[in-house]
From Swiss-Prot:
GO biological process: cellular response to oxidative stress
Protein name, per record: Uncharacterized monothiol glutaredoxin F10D7.3
Keyword field: 2Fe-2S, Iron, Iron-sulfur, Metal-binding
Domain of life: Eukaryota
Single annotated GO MF: metal ion binding
Organism for this UniProt entry: Caenorhabditis elegans
Xref: PANTHER family: GLUTAREDOXIN 2, GLUTAREDOXIN-1-RELATED
SUPFAM superfamilies membership: Thioredoxin-like (SSF52833)
Family: Belongs to the glutaredoxin family. Monothiol subfamily.
């Protein structure tokens, strides 16, 4: 009986240690993922978190396609095996888990509706210009009065 109890206690101890190590590994993985998200948001002038099948994400990307953005990264969350974790991390910075999420110059702008409203007020281009997110090396074409 004592031998069985000793084996059971050993198995419980091993299981506990394994669970603690797994938790530490998971925490490190989540921290690494958060660091990557923060790095992307801070280093890209325009950062979009989206899902390929989401109609609002498609509409936001269509709005942004009207601008010649030179530094934009789009992360399609549904193509990741960490979709839920990424959405929870994004919630820390945007207050929401839904997509799309647009960040310009490291600041959360909003989703489709907010971006569309900003564009309709004529404020999206100035926001992108202020972020130096638009191509500026275009050669102006002279107007010959034609």
């Amino acid at each position: 009986m004592l031998r069985i109890l000793t084996v059971v206690l050993a198995l419980v101890t091993i299981a506990t240690v394994h669970a603690e190590l797994s938790k530490k590994k998971e925490d490190k993985t989540l921290k690494d993922l958060e660091d990557k998200i923060v790095n992307d948001v801070m280093t890209h002038k325009v950062m979009v978190y989206s899902k390929t099948y989401c109609p609002w994400s498609k509409r936001l990307k269509a709005i942004l396609a009207n601008y010649e953005i030179d530094d934009m990264k789009i992360v399609e969350l549904d193509r990741s095996n960490q979709t839920e974790e990424m959405q929870e991390i994004l919630k820390k910075y945007s207050g929401r888990t839904t997509v799309p999420q647009l960040f310009i110059s490291g600041k959360f702008v909003g989703g489709h509706d907010e971006t569309k409203a900003i564009e309709e007020k004529g404020e999206l281009r100035p926001l992108l210009e202020k972020a130096h997110a638009l191509f500026t090396n275009r050669v102006p074409v002279p107007d010959n009065g034609a």
